[in-house]
């Protein structure tokens, strides 16, 4: 990918070290992912996008490992994701736990998410039954403020 896009500074990778989604979990993920980081560092990727916890679920599942260890081993930006609220995002940034915070699912049901976060407006919950359905319903029909 780095050759196709003209260098690692234009490429990132998404990692889900603690997810159980689709039975892809590992009983001991820390050595696997620390080794992966060691292997990808020479490519000078721009970022790692890390799903912290179980995808779309528990942020601190049993068997967790210190994701900050993963962050500090990587030689690029650390993008954190998974059920972040505005408060959690602010705390993570203030404590320098991540370089960037992702709000995946809230963007689906809140096309104006940034404005809602800035003004303290309530968020429209997404309808997971419409995820990956291939239809406009549930993706582009949520109201904006």
Give the positions of each predicted feature:
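Flavin-dependent oxidoreductase catalytic cores
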Residues: 2-145
């Amino acid at each position: 990918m780095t050759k196709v896009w003209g260098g690692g500074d234009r490429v990132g990778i998404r990692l889900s070290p603690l997810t159980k989604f689709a039975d892809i979990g590992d009983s001991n993920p820390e050595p696997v992912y620390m080794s992966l980081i060691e292997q990808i560092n020479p490519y000078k990727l721009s970022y790692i996008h890390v799903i912290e916890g179980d995808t779309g679920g528990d942020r601190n599942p049993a068997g967790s490992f210190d994701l900050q260890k993963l962050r500090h081993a990587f030689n690029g930006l650390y993008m954190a994701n998974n059920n972040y609220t505005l408060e959690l995002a602010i705390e993570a940034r203030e404590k320098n736990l991540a370089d960037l915070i992702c709000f995946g699912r809230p963007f689906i049901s809140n096309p104006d998410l940034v404005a809602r976060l800035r003004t303290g407006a309530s968020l429209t919950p997404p309808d997971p039954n419409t995820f990956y359905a291939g239809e406009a319903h549930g993706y582009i029909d949520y109201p904006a403020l």
